[in-house]
From Swiss-Prot:
Organism: Saccharopolyspora erythraea (strain ATCC 11635 / DSM 40517 / JCM 4748 / NBRC 13426 / NCIMB 8594 / NRRL 2338)
Purpose: Specifically methylates the N4 position of cytidine in position 1402 (C1402) of 16S rRNA.
Catalytic reaction(s) noted: cytidine(1402) in 16S rRNA + S-adenosyl-L-methionine = N(4)-methylcytidine(1402) in 16S rRNA + S-adenosyl-L-homocysteine + H(+)
Protein name: Ribosomal RNA small subunit methyltransferase H
Record keyword Flavoprotein present: no
EC number, as in UniProt: 2.1.1.199
Similarity comment: Belongs to the methyltransferase superfamily. RsmH family.
GO cellular component terms, A-Z: cytoplasm
GO biological process, one term: rRNA base methylation
Length: 330
């Protein structure tokens, strides 16, 4: 993500013009068996700029797509992009843990495909005044939904040193979390934080020089942690994954792309729990109805190719996992 932000700062251009969906061909390949058997329904839980959705609609003429996004700007732009398929598209302003409610609002209970492309979107990174990118001085906002109440500035200015340390350590995996938190508390006593440039300067000073030379941009982990906290990303994902898996019809498939280890571990655990037998290990035979609900379609997490990473820096950190429902839940 650091390399991506630096490149955006250097070469300009809007997300709408330069958006390249990550692992597009692999996503289409994995979802195709579930979507090519006549009329089908797929949910793009992280619609963003609509690149994956556009390709799915083009590949499957009988497909109905439900697109979810918490960002009203993303819904508007994706709606323009998907306008040629508007009779087969339902766009819903929702966070993806509102999965069941979104489907119920469309009188749907089961779906044939589910797609999650997690993390911050190209659109959000390119909109400087939203504060996601540390390469630009901007308001400390970081809300994926501009109508949400809590901003990154609120976190920085109101959390205790202990709370800040927890956020930085848990969500940024920042080994200097306590040191950074103490520096934030000292600095905000002089004046509240409201711009990202001041925070970046603090992080340069707080992170030891040796780590700055070897550990990437010193702001990377803190900005990730603040973004996750502001948007409750891990809590939302923890609720969304089981809801999405529950809604998959038998034969339905789900693809999840994550961009840091915290998300990927959650996806791995959610899939592993459903892919194992519920029969007690000391019994010699499988109990009826206790077999796995899903089968894994990927061996571990798949990575983007070197060629894709070179062409699309956002793909450098992607981890893709996929699964197929093979039986109804007990």
């Amino acid at each position: 993500m650091a390399d991506e932000q630096q490149r955006r700062a250097q070469d300009g251009g809007s997300a709408r013009d330069r958006h390249v969906p990550v692992m597009m061909e692999r996503t289409l390949e994995l979802l195709a068996p579930a979507l090519s058997k006549g009329p089908a329904v797929v949910v793009d839980a992280t619609l963003g700029m609509g690149g994956h959705s556009e390709a799915l609609l083009a590949a499957h003429p009988e497909l109905t797509l439900v697109g979810l996004d918490r960002d009203p700007d993303a819904l508007r732009l994706a709606g323009e992009r998907l306008a040629p398929h508007s009779d087969r598209v339902h766009l819903v302003h929702a966070v993806y843990d509102e999965w069941a409610e979104a489907l119920a609002g469309l009188s749907l209970s089961k779906v044939d495909g589910a797609l999650f492309d997690l993390g911050v979107s190209s659109l959000q990174l390119d909109e400087t005044d939203r504060g996601f990118a540390y390469a630009h001085d901007a308001p400390l906002d970081m809300r994926m939904d501009s109508g949400a109440p809590r901003t990154a500035a609120d976190v920085l200015n109101t959390y205790s040193a202990g709370e800040l340390t927890r956020v930085l350590r848990e969500y940024g995996e920042e080994k200097f979390a306590a040191r950074i938190a103490a520096a934030i508390v000292r600095e905000r006593a002089k004046a509240p934080f409201d711009r990202s440039g001041r925070l970046v300067e603090l992080l340069y000073d707080a992170v030891p020089a040796a780590s700055r030379r070897t550990g990437g941009h010193p702001a990377k982990r803190t900005f990730q942690a603040l973004r996750i906290e502001v948007n409750a990303e891990l809590e939302v994902l923890g609720r969304a994954l089981p809801a999405a898996l529950d809604s998959l019809a038998v034969g339905g498939r789900m693809v999840v792309m994550s961009y840091h280890s915290l998300e990927d571990r959650m996806v791995k655990r959610a899939f592993a729990e459903r892919a194992k037998s519920k029969t007690p290990v000391d019994l010699p035979v499988e109990l009826p109805g206790h077999g796995p609900e899903i089968r894994l379609l990927t061996r571990g997490a798949e990575l983007a190719s070197d060629a894709e990473t070179a062409a699309n820096p956002r793909a450098a950190s992607v981890r893709l996992r996929a699964a197929e429902r093979i039986k109804e839940a007990v």
